[in-house]
């Protein structure tokens, strides 16, 4: 209801804002650049952040910026993912029917990646979202997959994305040391500071096409206390309240 009241062309503070219209903090841009380097060099990276701090937005942006003529991106997000279903999920995305046994599926995937690299001259990027929910056995499989040709070459880039506990409660522990030693890059997205919160709100309002100054300095202060980029309710509540207040005064 507030879109018409404020003369908006698009709805702000929703999840389907085009990636190129999203606000990018300096930490966001730095992490995006590091992931591009990971993809190019076919490295193993881990990205963590608190819930709602922009992990999904980062992955959307990362995916949209990878040239389709140079990369094939495989994406999985399944809290119950087992090693067997990990290989099946990747092979399904490549249009192949996976073999029954895990070892056979792994070799099948490695052979297909060799074809992609050698014939299509493309690099493969595998993104595993919600990785903080995965069991140790599945996380170990990434290490085994990257043990390729006596470690002389990495067959693909692997990016594990998850909440902060992926690193703090799992990968930092001694029992995960073998996995941690294979990690080439670790990135974390922090919460926005007050200035970044104001820019974040401004980017959404610019996308909406609204020319009015809707959010006062005090409103931005209050939003900054509670907002994280993936949770849009605080600014939306203010927009709705403004409409209701003006409606009651008319």
Report the location of each language-model feature.
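Helix-loop-helix "sensor" segment of P-loop NTPases
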Residues: 115-119, 150, 159, 167-226
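Residues at the beta-strand->loop junction immediately N-terminal to the Walker
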Residues: 48, 77, 128
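Conserved alpha-helical scaffold flanking the Walker A/P-loop in AAA+ ATPase domains
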Residues: 34-37, 103-119
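Walker A/P-loop nucleotide-binding motif
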Residues: 41-61
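A short, basic N-terminal segment
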Residues: 1-41
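Conserved NTP-binding/hydrolysis module of P-loop NTPases
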Residues: 11-12, 71-73, 81-100
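Conserved Walker B catalytic segment
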Residues: 44, 114, 121-160, 165, ...
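The conserved phosphate-sensing helix
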Residues: 216, 227-242
């Amino acid at each position: 209801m507030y879109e018409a009241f404020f003369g908006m062309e698009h709805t702000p503070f929703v999840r389907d804002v085009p990636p190129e219209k999203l606000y990018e903090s300096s930490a966001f841009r730095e992490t995006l650049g590091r992931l591009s380097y990971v993809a190019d060099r076919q490295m193993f990276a881990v990205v963590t952040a608190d819930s709602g701090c922009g992990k999904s937005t980062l992955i959307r942006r990362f995916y949209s910026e990878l040239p389709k003529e140079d990369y094939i991106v495989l994406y999985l997000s399944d809290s119950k993912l087992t090693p067997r279903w990990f290989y099946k999920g990747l092979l399904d995305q490549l249009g192949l029917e996976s073999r029954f046994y895990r070892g056979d599926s792994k070799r099948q995937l490695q052979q297909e990646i060799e074809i992609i690299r050698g014939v299509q001259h493309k690099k493969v990027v595998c993104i595993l979202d919600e990785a903080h929910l995965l069991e140790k056995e599945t996380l170990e499989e990434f290490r085994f997959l990257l043990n390729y040709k006596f470690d002389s070459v990495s067959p693909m880039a692997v990016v594990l994305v998850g909440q902060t506990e992926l690193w703090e409660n799992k990968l930092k522990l001694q029992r995960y040391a073998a996995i941690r030693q294979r990690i080439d890059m670790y990135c974390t997205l922090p919460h926005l500071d007050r200035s970044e919160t104001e820019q974040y709100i401004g980017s959404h309002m610019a996308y909406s096409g609204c020319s009015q100054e809707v959010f006062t300095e005090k409103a931005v202060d209050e939003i900054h206390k509670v907002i994280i980029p993936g949770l849009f309710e605080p600014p939306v509540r203010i927009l709705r309240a403004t409409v209701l207040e003006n409606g009651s005064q008319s």
